[in-house]
């Protein structure tokens, strides 16, 4: 088979760091609820999350292989990075989008409000999973 990626430092030990973060806001009126959702959607859109994740991958010493991002209607966003320990061969081909050298970083947002209650909520799920020599725990320093 051509175009195989060379694995190095592979140790079959997956290291994962996951966060589930919640923000609950008292929003008495429909206008306040929608204003909160608009604010969250602007602050945590896929472009902004991508920039934050670029910084995160630099912190753990990973190189980004591929980025997939999506904003949702009416609200919410998802971003996934495939990562490697070091830069790979340039122009590996489209198959690199489905396969990875070391692992992934994902962020998913879930802003919502309850129309019959005075609540607006925001949940973000962050998952960093690696194998090999890089570790997500270095982001905690």
Description of each model-found segment:
Residues 1-141:
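Polybasic/polar functional segments that serve as interface/processing modules
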